[in-house]
């Protein structure tokens, strides 16, 4: 009986601790682990480390976000990523950043970061930021026009978007609590997957005719 109580208590404690343990990237076990992006070793969480003698002296600094991206794109926006693939020094540290630039009327389409919470600051202009709650929170849209110097927060896994409502260019910088937050662009995922989602699945799910689905697929055949 005593053993059973101990086992139940132990399982309960594990359940309480599990969300905290799985909430972000694993904790690092050394000060620096500069990613060996050319390494052949298979990695599960993070990359293998370069010897510090080969890491150089610039792995703690980057100027990649200093320059605006080219917003002459179908979405009228440009994302400059600064994750572990672009900044190997972030390996095992559980952080990354992006810069997003917007032309007037440009958008960062509805998307999801499956592995990270996001916090951002608008650097220039005015952006409509929208966050979609899950079904159990009423599928509610939380939105606000966020101006230069103001911030926003997006919980991990929630769909969200940004749209430049101003008449001038806009930009924002966002940070993630993961070295590789991942991204799922909803329109591209639905209509540009490889191989494609069968049209009957989408016609039933979206309650539209097949010709509408085929039209949307043609828009995303070449990606974003």
Swiss-Prot record:
It comes from the Eukaryota. Residues 63-214 form the Cupin type-1 domain. Keywords: Apoplast, Cell wall, Cytoplasm, Disulfide bond, Glycoprotein, Manganese, Metal-binding, Oxidoreductase, Secreted, Signal. One of its GO terms (molecular function) is oxalate oxidase activity. GO terms for cellular component: apoplast; cytoplasm. Mn(2+) binds at residues 111, 113, 118, 160. It catalyses: oxalate + O2 + 2 H(+) = H2O2 + 2 CO2. Pfam families: Cupin_1. Disulfide bonds join 33-49. Its main location: secreted. Its EC number is 1.2.3.4. Glycans are attached at residues 70, 75. InterPro entries: Cupin_1, Germin, Germin_Mn-BS, RmlC-like_jellyroll, RmlC_Cupin_sf. It is an enzyme of class 1 (oxidoreductase). Associated mostly with highly substituted forms of glucuronogalactoarabinoxylans. PANTHER family: GERMIN-LIKE PROTEIN SUBFAMILY 3 MEMBER 3. Belongs to the germin family. Produces developmental and stress-related release of hydrogen peroxide in the apoplast. May play an important role in several aspects of plant growth and defense mechanisms. This is Oxalate oxidase GF-2.8. It comes from Triticum aestivum.
């Amino acid at each position: 009986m005593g053993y059973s109580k101990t086992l139940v208590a132990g399982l309960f404690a594990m359940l309480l601790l599990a969300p905290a343990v799985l909430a972000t990237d694993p904790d690092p076990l050394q000060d620096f682990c500069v990613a060996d992006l050319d390494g052949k070793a298979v990695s599960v969480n993070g990359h293998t480390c370069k010897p510090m003698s080969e890491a150089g002296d610039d792995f703690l600094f980057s100027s990649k976000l200093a320059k605006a991206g080219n917003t002459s794109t179908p979405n009228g926006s440009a994302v400059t990523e600064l994750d572990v693939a672009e900044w190997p020094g972030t390996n095992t540290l559980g952080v990354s950043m992006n810069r997003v630039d917007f032309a007037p009327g440009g958008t960062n389409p509805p998307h999801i970061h499956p592995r990270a919470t996001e916090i951002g600051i608008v650097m220039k202009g005015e952006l409509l930021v929208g966050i979609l709650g899950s079904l159990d929170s009423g599928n509610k849209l939380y939105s606000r026009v966020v101006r230069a110097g103001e911030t926003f927060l997006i919980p991990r896994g929630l769909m969200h978007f940004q749209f430049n409502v101003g008449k001038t260019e806009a930009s924002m910088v966002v940070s993630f609590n993961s070295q590789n937050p991942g991204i799922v662009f909803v329109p591209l995922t639905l209509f540009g997957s490889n191989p494609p989602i069968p049209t009957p699945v989408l016609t039933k799910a979206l309650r539209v005719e097949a010709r509408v689905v085929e039209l949307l697929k043609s828009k995303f055949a070449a990606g974003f």
